[in-house]
Amino acid sequence: MATTTVPTKPRRDEIPTLGVEEEFVLVDPHTGRPSLSNTDVIASGRELGITLQPELSRCQIETATSIGTHIRDLRDQLCESRAVTADAAARTGCQLLAVGTPMYSPPHDSITDTPRHRRIAEQFGALATGVMCGCHVHVGVPGREQAIQIINHLRPWLPTLLALTANSPIADGCDTGYASWRYILFGHWPSAGPPPYFDSAAHYDAALAKMLESGAILDNRMVFWDVRAADHPPTVEVRISDVPATVEETMTLTTLVHALVITAADAIERGTPAPTVDHEALRGACWRAARDGLSGHGFDLTTMGLIPAPRLIYQLLTHVKPVLVELGECGQVTGSLAAVLEHGNGAIRQRRTLARHGRVADVIAECARRTFEGCLTEPDDALPL
């Protein structure tokens, strides 16, 4: 008896690699003010078997996953790194917060004492005193030329990723009026913001050379664009997001970025050019995302008009849904996005807690709890605020 077969879409030969970096604030558990103790926490983490990195301010710490290809493998790493880092912080008398900015300003002498960090402080003055914690998602690419093309395809989606993860509405003990105050602060750096559209890797490298020559950056690591090309190994690094409040939100962000890069690579393979979004319109959309987050409006770069911010999330989900289905992640991402839209992201929850209790101390306590929410363990010696 003859049989027929139904043609199916061929399996993707290779899934791009993934890696995630998260930056955190260290605070005094009794006052909520920044704790300048990253060196001690790094040493404590080493004893617990985790490698932590210092950031520009002594009240910051960074974690990084290993490189892998499966989203769900990263979840265990993210949970473990948050829980163990919170434990390392507690053992040195401080508390770990997944927030985009500290809710109180650090002292002016907060620069981490390394040659590189001192050089940055000397060159950029008061800019270096700002404390900003983000989440950086690296997705592997074959080479630099394709990385630049993918960056062009990702530009229109940057504001949506920021609105989704906004997690820094409070600074100096007050609501700033922005869902992501971190993004506004970061915009003061000369190499920050959305990148322009680049014709080629040579065009991209020429822009870096001009910034180096002017002193706007000291090296290529100081290119703070919202998405950039990274080397060794070659990746596209999406940097626009505040550090998400929870592991679940970091997982959602990571999966969306992974799907965006794969979707862009597929478009490049088909010969579909990236949209040449006007740079000033994109900057305006990013500002709007920083201001409103998910609770207000976003700027639609197709219609050039304001729309409810949740509609931007639905547009993003529609754009990457075929890849999410292929990766087996559509249900997880759809459910996570629905939960965020119903219950709020980090910025919304911080404001809700502040409105309910009227004390920044309660916001800090809630943020500390959510930092390792859903993780397997909690810090052994966590101190209540």
From Swiss-Prot:
Keyword ATP-binding listed: yes
InterPro entries in UniProt: GCL_type2/YbdK_subfam, GCS2, Gln_synth/guanido_kin_cat_dom, YbdK
Entry keyword Nucleotide-binding: yes
Xref: SUPFAM superfamilies: Glutamine synthetase/guanido kinase (SSF55931)
GO biological-process terms attached to the record: modified amino acid biosynthetic process
Similarity comment text for this entry: Belongs to the glutamate--cysteine ligase type 2 family. YbdK subfamily.
Protein name stated in the entry: Putative glutamate--cysteine ligase 2-4
Species in which this protein is naturally found: Rhodococcus jostii (strain RHA1)
Taxonomy of the source species: Bacteria, Bacillati, Actinomycetota, Actinomycetes, Mycobacteriales
